[in-house]
């Protein structure tokens, strides 16, 4: 979520705690069954797949160097309360693996939406919602198109960003 208005930012001041730690230890840091919602933008690339950035921080953010999909889902399943929601943005090429692992950890995929940079391009992102302890049933939302053919944000993206 992007916060565009300063007053919106100030209303969240006392509601956010920033904790620094290893995500592989999340259940030890926060305890089991402690959160109703988890939102994640994890590293997308496995090993050396994709372009390697010389900037170590960017490399770690984009590649599963310190945190794998298994690490994220295992700890999320522990930390989420029953019927808690799990949200993630990832790459479509990993969907079969993502759905398999979510189910293996008891987080049922409930909704997905493919994100296309342009209407005539393949999707490059996928938005996923899961439910801990949910029953099998996946809803597929209409695709989200980010840019018009002229390179401007689409009306929907402008609305999502609070710019319309």
For the regions a protein language model found, what residue spans apply to each?
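S-adenosyl-L-methionine
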Residues: 3-36
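Short, glycine/acidic-enriched loop or turn micro-motifs at the edges of active sites
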Residues: 25, 44, 132
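Glycine/Thr-rich phosphate-binding loops of Rossmann-like dinucleotide-binding domains
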Residues: 27, 48, 96
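Short amphipathic alpha-helical segments
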Residues: 32, 50-53, 99-102
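Mobile active-site "lid"/loop adjacent to the S-adenosyl-L-methionine
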Residues: 36-37, 42-71
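Conserved Class I SAM-dependent methyltransferase catalytic core
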Residues: 65-117, 121-123, 127
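SAM/dcSAM-binding transferase cores
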Residues: 122-164
């Amino acid at each position: 979520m992007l916060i565009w208005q300063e007053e919106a930012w100030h209303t969240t001041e006392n509601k956010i705690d920033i904790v620094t730690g290893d995500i592989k230890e999340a259940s030890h840091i926060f305890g089991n069954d402690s959160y109703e919602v988890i939102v994640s933008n994890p590293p997308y690339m496995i090993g050396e797949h994709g372009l390697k950035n010389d900037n170590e921080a960017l490399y770690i953010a984009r590649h599963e160097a310190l945190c794998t999909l298994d690490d994220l889902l295992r700890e999320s399943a522990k930390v989420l309360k029953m019927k808690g929601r799990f949200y993630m943005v990832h790459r479509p090429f990993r969907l079969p693996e993502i759905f398999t692992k979510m189910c293996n950890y008891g987080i049922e995929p409930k909704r997905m939406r493919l994100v296309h940079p342009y209407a005539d391009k393949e999707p490059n992102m996928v938005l996923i919602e899961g439910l801990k302890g949910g029953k099998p049933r996946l809803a597929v939302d209409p695709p989200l198109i980010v840019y018009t053919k002229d390179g401007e944000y689409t009306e929907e993206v402008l609305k999502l960003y609070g710019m319309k």
